[in-house]
């Protein structure tokens, strides 16, 4: 079996060159899915996984825009249309200087499995640019977004490819992108998700990824007859996902003690309550300042520069910042400090070695493709509402989100349980996501 996995990975590596993030994502899937394929005659000779790791389409383009000083700037734009076997391509746009082909291919590949797990008819894709929105004026961001959409518009559509937000792309950017698309196409359609409520958005969409991460952890804890009440929670990040993961944790009676950004983390031993969280939301969403400002307002807290929060003692860890933020040493520290549950809010925030450490200890560990699928699930619900020209209530969307996260959890248990009662959620998520897409690809022939 190891030889089969190695030969497959060698072939993918040879085809894709130096793309470490993409290879990390493929390796994780191959380790669990190839043994499953070997035992299922229906997939023999079809090269299904090899077809899944090859994008259906890779789009790269130039984005020119004018900054506030009148100088022309040039960035690169991308869209990876990975797999459309079960629905139109669906996945976010990321604006960040680190964006490259490897990162977007990894995100698009993960998105295929994540979208499959939601039970909704969505394929997988991802896109973005190496543009850095930090320090830019609203007008500069608008001009960049309009330049970006001037090329992207010809490759997307409500039945073809429906982008959304990601790191560096929030409600403001989605608004600029949608406005330009509407102008270019002269039509009002659900071509983007994450829109404002008054122009086609869905209630709960901003909260969905963070809420879903917590709902998934709730489902895992329930298998041990446990819950969030009085648990100590360590959260990384302070963006959208982290904010709403914190909000839902607080609502469930837990004590959130950390949040972070790229400058370091804050630790509040008294706990970040609802009032303090509102301060952080205003700090990050409106004032766009560093999380360290929290310690000026609340002097009983401390700020640790250039570090991640995984050394803080906790019951539950929710990594909600970015890929590979939690390494094997962090995993060992969390385990030594008594952590019983890790639910990934970001995409692939734990390194491969860290994941193996959690699995070896047999704690509750949820991979991002399962636990943070609430965001894209609610994007799917937004697409449904756009098609119906109708809006569900906040309660209706939240209930649907809870149901979807429970279904994802049940699928992970179905494919990830061993004979001793341990649930390998990584294995379960990979196989459950694979089966739906693979069966659709078989049914549609060689295309």
Name each region found by the language model.
Residues 196, 201-311:
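Glycine-rich phosphate/diphosphate-binding loop of Rossmann-like nucleotide-binding domains
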Residues 33, 104-107, 177, 213-221, ...:
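Buried hydrophobic packing segments
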Residues 1-203, 436-445:
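N-terminal ligand-binding/catalytic initiation module
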Residues 78-79, 121, 128, 160-161, ...:
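Structural motif
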Residues 3, 17-24, 28, 43, ...:
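Conserved active-site and cofactor/substrate-binding residues in soluble primary-metabolism enzymes
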Residues 106, 160-164, 187-192, 235, ...:
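General beta-strand structural signal in soluble alpha/beta enzymes
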Residues 264-365, 370:
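Rossmann-like adenosine-cofactor binding region
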Residues 2-25, 220-221, 335-447:
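Adenosine-phosphate binding glycine-rich loop
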């Amino acid at each position: 079996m190891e030889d089969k996995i190695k030969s497959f990975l060698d072939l993918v590596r040879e085809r894709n060159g130096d793309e470490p993030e993409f290879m990390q994502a493929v390796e994780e899937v191959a380790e669990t899915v190839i043994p499953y394929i070997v035992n299922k005659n229906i997939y023999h000779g079809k090269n299904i996984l090899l077809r899944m790791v090859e994008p259906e389409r890779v789009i790269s383009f130039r984005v020119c825009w004018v900054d506030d000083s009148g100088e022309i700037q040039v960035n690169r734009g991308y869209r990876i249309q990975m797999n459309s076997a079960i629905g139109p391509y669906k996945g976010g746009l990321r604006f960040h200087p680190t964006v490259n082909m490897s990162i977007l291919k990894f995100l698009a590949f993960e998105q295929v499995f994540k979208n499959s797990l939601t039970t909704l008819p969505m394929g997988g894709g991802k896109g973005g640019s190496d543009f850095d929105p930090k320090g830019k004026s609203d007008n500069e961001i608008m001009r960049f977004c309009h330049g970006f959409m001037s090329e992207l518009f010809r490759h997307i559509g409500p039945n073809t490819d429906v982008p959304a937000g990601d790191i560096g792309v929030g409600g403001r950017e989605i608004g600029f992108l949608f406005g330009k698309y509407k102008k270019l196409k002269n039509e009002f359609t659900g071509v983007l998700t994450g829109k404002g409520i008054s122009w086609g958005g869905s209630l709960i969409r901003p909260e969905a990824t963070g809420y879903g991460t917590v709902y998934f952890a709730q489902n895992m804890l329930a298998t041990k007859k446990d819950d969030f009440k009085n648990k100590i929670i360590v959260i990384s990040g302070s963006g959208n996902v982290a904010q709403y993961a914190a909000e839902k944790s607080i609502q469930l009676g837990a004590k959130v003690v950390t949040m972070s950004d790229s400058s370091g983390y804050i630790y509040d031993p008294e706990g970040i309550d609802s009032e303090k969280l509102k301060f952080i939301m205003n700090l990050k969403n409106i004032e766009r300042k560093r999380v360290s400002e929290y310690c000026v307002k609340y002097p009983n807290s401390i700020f640790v520069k250039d570090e991640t929060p995984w050394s803080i003692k906790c019951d539950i860890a929710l990594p909600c910042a970015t890929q590979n933020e939690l390494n094997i040493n962090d995993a060992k520290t969390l385990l030594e400090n008594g952590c019983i549950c890790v639910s990934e809010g970001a995409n692939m925030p734990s390194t491969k070695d860290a994941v193996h450490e959690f699995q070896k200890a047999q704690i509750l560990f949820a991979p991002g493709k399962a636990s943070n699928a609430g965001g894209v699930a609610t994007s799917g619900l937004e697409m449904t509402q756009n098609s119906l020209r109708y809006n569900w209530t906040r309660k209706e969307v939240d209930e649907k989100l809870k149901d979807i996260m429970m279904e994802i959890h049940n699928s992970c248990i179905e494919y990830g349980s061993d004979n001793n009662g341990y649930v390998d959620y990584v294995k379960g998520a990979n196989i459950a996501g694979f089966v739906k897409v693979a069966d659709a690809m078989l049914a549609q022939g060689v295309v």
